[in-house]
Amino acid sequence: MRGAAFAPPWRSAPGQSLGFTKPQSTRRAHPIESDTVRRMRASPAEYLRLDLRAHDLLRDVPLYDVSIVDLPGGGAGRSIADIRALESAAAPSGVANTIYGLRRFLGRVFGWDHVSIRPEDSRLSRLSERDRRDSEITPGTPVGSFLLLYQFPGEALSETRNATVHGYVCTALAPTASGYRLYWGIYVIPVSWLTRPYLIAIEPFRRILYPAMLRRIRRAWLAAYGATA
């Protein structure tokens, strides 16, 4: 998945905190912008009601944020593999590429990305034989700066680790009355003193990248399948 550096957002689950409160912006949001952001955020309760393997595998990892996008139509049998194909085919905007490039540059300068996942810290070793057998992609396959743990038809889980965070991204696709809903769940484990300032620093960029990414997927979905397919 693109954007690994910006995947960990800041929103702790009830009773879970890294010891600080996310600063509140004093800027008055434009009504359209505000509505877009609101519609792309899901309550943790809605996400946690889904029947996902990630809930058990990451039961001791804080869930920090859930983003959603509704995908109308699509027909029967759409899967995470379709979402990955659409995401790969839809090129990020110039702004997104600039932000990704800035993060890669800072990672090289400060050595953030020289830290790799130790086998004993990865959830890869916790996968069951059934997980490994049912995964459509070999568990442990590198995908950009992530390690793919599994990909099922309705769910995929990826893991990343650097000097700033140990994070997980769960993508889930659930059928709805009008099509499908894509969920993008983010989990974060603090790894050092850098985690806290890093998460604060990337929050403005994340507010740009996440909605843009989900809108890009939705446009690609509509182009591929149409709203009434």
PLM regions and their residue ranges:
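Short, highly charged C-terminal tails/helix-capping segments
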Residues: R218-A229
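Hydrophobic-ligand binding "helix-grip"
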Residues: R133-T176
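Hydrophobic ligand-binding cavity/cleft-lining segments
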Residues: E33-R132
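Short acidic, glycine/tyrosine-flanked loop/strand segments centered on an H-E-D-like triad
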Residues: A172-L194
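A short acidic/glycine-rich loop-to-helix N-cap element
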Residues: V188-L209
